[in-house]
Amino acid sequence: MADLLKLCLRIAYAYGRLTGVINFKIDLKTGQALVTRGATLISVSTHLLIFALLLYQTMRKSVVNVMWKYANSLHEYVFLVIAGFRVVCVFLELVSRWSQRRTFVRLFNSFRRLYQRNPDIIQYCRRSIVSKFFCVTMTETLHIIVTLAMMRNRLSIALALRIWAVLSLTAIINVIITQYYVATACVRGRYALLNKDLQAIVTESQSLVPNGGGVFVTKCCYLADRLERIAKSQSDLQELVENLSTAYEGEVVCLVITYYLNMLGTSYLLFSISKYGNFGNNLLVIITLCGIVYFVFYVVDCWINAFNVFYLLDAHDKMVKLLNKRTLFQPGLDHRLEMVFENFALNLVRNPLKLHMYGLFEFGRGTSFAVFNSLLTHSLLLIQYDVQNF
């Protein structure tokens, strides 16, 4: 599993360089991130080529009509809006990448140091990272298969370049969300280690019998020192999370909009297939099935992304609950140990871990449920409008 994870991370780095999202170089031997002229030229060239091809595509015949002879005006409108928002969102994400390049370099180096100091965090997030890479690989592969199959009778070099430009947008989105996912998973792994150590301290503190002896005082001082180190590590970790959220907040807002519209468009597309039948030129049923499987993996990918954040918030809440067990300690413990527990708990109350994005929304299960409810409502309204008017 460790070798598989290392392979996934290397592929992600290569994919990030290929799409220009990672506009700096990482020394694979030392892990140090550096801004170089070569990395800058590669990223700039890739982005200029992608947007030049997209600009050329907007001047050509609608891709929807080319792919599907039954396309109506609603299909044109829906997929035009989705494509437009996707281009704008990707453009804003890349602007954020370039304007904050030094910030992302410092952020990457911070996570590199976090891993070097705590290599055990990988065992708590290895499986989730590999699962994420599997879902992304499947969605992108199925996306390519379905797109090429629909265009197989009209495929040319020019059209292939246009398709590549469109698929590059999806690749850029996946690279960014995967980076955020891996970073969040690493933080979650570090929280798991801190909670494990904190649980041990709480258990030992509960077993203490106050007697004022030298051994008792020494034991309390030893536990207080360990607890102070955990409190310092948690404070540094929460600061890292805040820096991560600040750097990614613009990109995450764009990604949420993109995911929302993609889910809406895909659900409407599946309805249209069931209503109007296969695409033009007697498209094989297997391609329709690939589209359905793609939608399933896309939903699973969204679910994995959401629960990665939920588990991080749960890990923080678990730390708060562990500290609340201090009320069960026997009276008469060492004053310093009690004060360290109190200060740690008060600090978590004053500075709760909350992931805000421009003040627009806060990550959490309630927010995700509201987004899902809104997505379901808008999908049904779109389908209802199609049924009534076409």
Swiss-Prot record:
This is Putative gustatory receptor 59d. The gene is Gr59d. Keywords: Cell membrane, Membrane, Receptor, Transducer, Transmembrane, Transmembrane helix. Belongs to the insect chemoreceptor superfamily. Gustatory receptor (GR) family. Gr22e subfamily. GO terms for biological process: monoatomic ion transmembrane transport; sensory perception of taste; signal transduction. The chain crosses the membrane at residues 39-59, 76-96, 129-149, 157-177, 253-273, 284-304, 367-383. It comes from Drosophila melanogaster. The keyword Amino-acid biosynthesis does not apply. It comes from the Eukaryota. Probable gustatory receptor which mediates acceptance or avoidance behavior, depending on its substrates. One of its GO terms (cellular component) is dendrite. Its main location: membrane. The lineage of its organism: Eukaryota, Metazoa, Ecdysozoa, Arthropoda, Hexapoda. Expressed in the adult labellar chemosensory neurons. In larvae, is expressed in neurons of the terminal external chemosensory organ as well as in the dorsal pharyngeal sense organ. It is found in: Cell membrane. The keyword Transmembrane helix applies.
